[in-house]
């Protein structure tokens, strides 16, 4: 990365009108890339200009018209793959809440400085799960123009031949209602559901005060339970129906044989099935049910008996997984043996040590049983990796590193070893971030861009850095977590705020059947799209092959413009954490 440094000059001007240096090169307004939602007063404030010919910039108060700041460019950096040179501007010295205008080289853009600036994002990201609910009408009083009729009651689901057992032979009718649509499609998947809830509930435990005050206008908002847990409960109820009551195994997914077209849920016609039980489904189920048993114990008034039921289900699922440690879900093999063939999302995984570690850890903290502690230590990771549905080691680590958790001496030593690996990861991630084209840990390697990268790499990297901050109190980790958030909100190569319904330039045509079929021009808000993907597996027309610009805002681009619950779980996790840390102390 070629870096040309300039001496930074910052000054607050008191009543003086200082003229801007004549433009070196006139640029369009959209060449200025910044966080389109705004900044907290004491947050680092960075903008990037899509030009290498910038020297001076000015900040004006948009209300009074007064010039409040003038600065020199911080540095220029050249992209490793697109050959573009960009300039970084730092205006962190501006801290007074208000609306401002940044002017540079003939271009200008407005931005906000305000308290709780990420609250609308955190709320919208969590509210997206309400829009994904199945089997119930999405009502106008909660959804506004995006209200719709109920679809997929799932009270007439068939046991697929791959899932048949003596007590439930193929063709048996079961009821498996509620739950969330997984992504742009209309199916429901245990692996992704378990991971998504596990990540969000891990964050919930860090900021109890924050989540107790959050209201997102869902049907349960007036009960005694925080809205986040209410929303999780809607999917947890469905997950419980996916457990075979006889042996404790968990069906991998509830699905149609093929993806439905872009039609309203109420117009879908395909028969739905539960398919093969899998070890990863059982363990993700066990982990999240054990975790939920602790969290919902305080809310018996709203959800009587759930905590006990969840823990019993968790232990039963874990026992099944121990008996079937190699029961991996392989859709190709399944289709060679059974009909109808299944062609929907696979969520295949041929390694279950991470799921065993996470499930055993959660069960240990929920039951105190030594056997689960021993299993967790036996399956513990040697290095830290950011969380993802295909690698849940981090969720187990988060359980061990929960602030305020009382651990005995041996457990503390084990937790400290996990903390060491987390910090090694965090230090590597932030190395050199302040010299990159977009002044962020994410986005500086072509390998950062792939299917779902904005959540699975950018957001989950940010979540990991936030945990590193909580473990150490070192601001450098938190600053870099904010930088990754700035990236998805506009400080990036395309200039998109990658969350629907937010910012000044956001996706209008996500690969999302609910949005595409509702006859409403604007997409349902609050969804993080997958992001730039040079793999371009969908065959859509992309304007460039450059890794960080390989994005197209079209409905057919499932490789770059789809939405998914696990991606939004990552958005909920980081947006809520950063907002909570700016407002509330950790409880």
Curated annotation (Swiss-Prot):
Q: What is its EC number?
A: 3.2.1.151
For this UniProt record, give its keywords in alphabetical order, as a comma-separated list: Carbohydrate metabolism, Cell outer membrane, Glycosidase, Hydrolase, Lipoprotein, Membrane, Palmitate, Polysaccharide degradation, Signal
Q: Protein name, please?
A: Xyloglucan-specific endo-beta-1,4-glucanase BoGH9A
Covalent lipidation (N-palmitoyl cysteine), chain numbering: 20
One further remark on this entry is: Gut bacteria supply the human body with energy from dietary polysaccharides through glycosidases that are absent in the human genome. Xyloglucans are a ubiquitous family of highly branched plant cell wall polysaccharides present in the vegetables we consume. Enzymes involved in xyloglucan degradation mediate the conversion of otherwise indigestible plant polysaccharides to short-chain fatty acids.
Mutant lacking the gene: phenotype: No visible phenotype. No effect on growth.
Write down the Gene3D superfamilies for this protein, in alphabetical order: 1.50.10.10, Immunoglobulins
GO MF, one term, reads: xyloglucan-specific endo-beta-1,4-glucanase activity
What the protein does comes down to:
Catalyzes endohydrolysis of 1,4-beta-D-glucosidic linkages in xyloglucan with retention of the beta-configuration of the glycosyl residues in xyloglucan degradation. Cleaves the backbone of the 3 major types of natural xyloglucans (seed galactoxyloglucan from tamarind kernel, dicot fucogalactoxyloglucan from lettuce leaves, and solanaceous arabinogalactoxyloglucan from tomato fruit), to produce xyloglucan oligosaccharides. May be superfluous in xyloglucan degradation compared to BoGH5A (AC A7LXT7), the other Xyloglucan-specific endo-beta-1,4-glucanase.
- Please give a single GO biological process term from the UniProt record: symbiotic process benefiting host
Q: Give the signal peptide range.
A: 1-19
């Amino acid at each position: 990365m070629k870096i040309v440094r300039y001496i930074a000059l910052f000054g607050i001007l008191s009543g003086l009108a200082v003229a801007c240096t004549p433009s070196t090169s006139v640029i369009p307004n959209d060449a200025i890339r910044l966080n389109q939602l705004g900044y907290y007063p004491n947050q680092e404030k960075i903008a990037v200009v899509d030009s290498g010919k910038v020297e001076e910039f000015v900040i004006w108060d948009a209300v009074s018209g007064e010039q409040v700041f003038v600065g020199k460019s911080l540095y220029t950096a050249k992209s490793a793959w697109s050959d573009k040179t960009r300039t970084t501007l730092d205006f962190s010295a501006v801290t007074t809440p208000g609306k401002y205008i940044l002017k540079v080289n003939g271009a200008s853009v407005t931005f906000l400085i305000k308290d709780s600036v990420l609250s609308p994002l955190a709320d919208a990201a969590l509210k997206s799960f309400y829009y994904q609910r199945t089997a119930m009408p999405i009502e106008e009083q909660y959804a506004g123009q995006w209200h719709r009729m109920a679809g997929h009651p799932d009270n007439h689901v068939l046991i697929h031949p791959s899932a048949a057992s003596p007590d439930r032979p193929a063709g048996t009718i079961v009821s498996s209602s509620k739950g969330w649509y997984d992504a742009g499609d209309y199916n429901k998947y245990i692996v992704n559901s378990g991971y998504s809830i596990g990540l969000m509930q891990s964050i919930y435990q860090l900021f109890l005060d924050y989540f107790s005050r959050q209201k997102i206008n869902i049907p349960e908002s007036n009960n005694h339970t925080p809205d986040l847990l209410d929303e999780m409960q809607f999917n947890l109820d469905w997950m419980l129906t996916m457990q075979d009551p006889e042996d404790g195994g968990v069906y991998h997914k509830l699905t149609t044989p093929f993806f439905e077209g872009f039609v309203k849920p109420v117009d879908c016609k395909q028969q739905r099935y539960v398919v093969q039980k899998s070890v990863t489904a059982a363990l993700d189920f066990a982990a999240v049910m054990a975790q939920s048993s602790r969290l919902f114990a305080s809310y018996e008034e709203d959800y009587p008996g759930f905590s006990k039921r969840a823990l019993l289900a968790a232990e039963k699922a874990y026992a099944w997984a121990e008996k079937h440690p190699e029961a991996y879900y392989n859709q190709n093999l399944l289709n060679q043996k059974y009909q109808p063939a299944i062609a929907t999302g696979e969520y295949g995984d041929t390694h279950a040590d991470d799921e065993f570690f996470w499930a055993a850890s959660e069960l240990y903290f929920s039951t105190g049983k030594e056997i689960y502690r021993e299993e967790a230590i036996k399956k513990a990771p040697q290095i830290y990796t950011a969380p993802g549905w295909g690698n849940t080691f981090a969720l187990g680590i988060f359980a061990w590193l929960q602030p305020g958790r009382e651990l005995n001496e041996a457990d503390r030593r084990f937790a400290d070893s996990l903390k060491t690996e987390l910090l090694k990861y965090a230090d590597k991630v932030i190395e050199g971030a302040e010299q990159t084209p977009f002044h962020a840990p994410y986005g500086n390697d072509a390998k950062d861009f792939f299917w779902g990268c904005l959540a699975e790499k950018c957001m989950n990297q940010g979540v990991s850095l936030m945990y590193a901050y909580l473990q150490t109190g070192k601001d450098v980790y938190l600053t870099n977590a904010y930088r990754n958030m700035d990236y998805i909100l506009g400080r990036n190569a395309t200039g998109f705020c990658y969350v629907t319904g937010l910012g000044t330039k956001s996706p209008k045509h996500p690969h999302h059947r609910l949005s595409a079929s509702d006859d409403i021009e604007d997409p349902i808000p609050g969804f993080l799209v997958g992001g730039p993907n040079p793999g371009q597996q969908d065959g859509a027309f992309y304007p460039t092959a450059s890794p960080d610009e390989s994005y197209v805002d079209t409905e057919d681009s499932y490789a770059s413009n789809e939405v998914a619950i696990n991606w939004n779980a990552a958005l909920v996790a980081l947006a809520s954490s950063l907002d909570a840390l700016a407002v509330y102390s950790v409880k």
